[in-house]
Amino acid sequence: MKKPVLVVMAAGMGSRYGGLKQIDPVDKEGHIIMDFSIYDAVQAGFQKVVFIIKKENEADFRSAIGDRLSNQLEVSYVFQDLHNIPEGYEVPEGRVKPWGTGHAVLSCINEIDGPFVVINADDYYGSHAFKMAYDFLTSEEKDEDVYHYMMVGYRLENTLTENGHVARGVCVTDEEGHLIKINERTHIEKHDGGTAYTEDDGKTWTMLPEGSVVSMNMWGFSNSILK
């Protein structure tokens, strides 16, 4: 069975941070969040990472991030091109923001020939998440044409911050833990009575139950998703 590949969506990093060289380290040794994700992934069993980046950021990304990781695992790069879309679709005039997760994954089609896990470049997932994802995709021999997919979910209260609001995908699952749908909530905050979200700039708030499962955008797929 082919080993799972880690796919890291990093095409938006430059715009969010004002350039790759401005990414703030999170410890005294100069590590960034992605360093911890790569370490945890390697410990879980991953041996290859594919970085999805913008073509114009390639040199900076290699020197700031990619080259120093190449002694830990195989490193590949693909480019998320705004205009690389399926036939029959058009890019809206004036759009410069990269498309979402689905388009990012489509960019990897020539680099992945087996199962894979997709994460954001700038979110912290924890070592247990990578182990769960890897084990799910390697637990037994599976037909790569079968829709064998997963998402790592988190308890909402464990993903909040004391410094403002967060955006999270609130999951709806059935009794067996199967994902039915995700409701995107772009403004979630802690309140005295619990956790709530607003969709009208704070005029009204809707409480979210304690223990709600949310997505941090960590997905695992068999290769069938690319066929």
Task: Place the predicted regions along the sequence by residue.
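Aromatic-glycine-rich donor-binding/catalytic loop that engages nucleotide-sugar donors
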Residues: 224-227
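Conserved N-terminal catalytic core of the sugar/cofactor nucleotidyltransferase
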Residues: 1-14, 28-120, 125-132, 139, ...
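Conserved catalytic-core motifs of eukaryotic protein kinase domains, centered on the activation segment
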Residues: 19-20
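A conserved hydrophobic position in a structured secondary element of the catalytic/binding core
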Residues: 53, 220-221
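Conserved core of the sugar-phosphate nucleotidyltransferase
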Residues: 127-219
